[in-house]
Amino acid sequence: MSANALLKRGSLAFGAIGVAAVLYRRMLRGAILNWGATDGEAHARLPGDELLEQADGIATRAITIDAPASAVWPWIAQIGPSPRGGAYTYDWIENLLGLNMHSTDRVLPAYQHPQIGDVLGYGKNRMRFERVEPRRVLASRSEDGNWVWSFVLDERNGQTRLISRNRFRLPSLSAKIGMVPMEPASLVMERKMLHGIKQRAERLAATRPYAALPPPSTQGSERSSWQSPGASSSSLPT
């Protein structure tokens, strides 16, 4: 094959990649990053955002759970690698990455009172709890400060809106390139996680009186005045 033919093929390949990238950003990226979230939730300033003000990317995913926050919080509180409760997603994928996740269907009393400063994970995957409001907010930040992951619970009329917000900074070109396949991959994992929490919380609420759930600890936590988008409404998105 001649040099001109190779150059032409290379130009066509780069052109196709460029077109695919534009189509992805314009047509698919918003749906992937904001699965399940309303426009108000996707654009709202949520608790935990203050931990990484200048973010290169934001993902906001959400689900409505037919259970009160008291039945949802236990699964959020104990999230994390073994011996904690896992991430309620595809464990086999997590463990291929060496994350030591084993999702449990049980509430683990030893991990029901997360504290600011608690550390999850190992090495470069370490996350530290930075904001804890029992039954309302759990926000953690990576050790390098480039990733913040927040769970926000909004309860109304016995239902809970669970919002998962990821804010991330991409300080290098390799990080930016690596994020392209990570965005759809993270949707696969996080969608499974949100449904996993929903199933566990609804089962817990159906089999156990709400009042019997462990009371929240206020030690090492703070309370915000945040109100969710549409807080004036008595109903949550379906």
Enumerate the language-model features and the residues they cover.
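Short, hydrophobic/aromatic-rich segments at coil-to-beta transitions
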Residues: 113, 117, 131-140
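Long, non-transmembrane cytosolic or organellar matrix-exposed soluble domains/tails
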Residues: 160-169, 182-238
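A short, structured loop/turn motif at beta-sheet edges
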Residues: 66-70, 131-135, 152-161, 201-205
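Hydrophobic ligand-binding cavity/cleft-lining segments
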Residues: 12, 18-116, 206-231, 236-238
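Beta-strand/loop substructures that line and gate deep hydrophobic ligand-binding cavities in soluble
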Residues: 35, 42, 141-199
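Short, charged/polar surface micro-motifs in flexible loops or helix N-caps
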Residues: 70, 81-82, 134-137, 146
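Short, surface-exposed coil-to-beta transition loops
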Residues: 58-59, 124-125, 146-150
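Membrane-penetrating hydrophobic segments
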Residues: 1-13
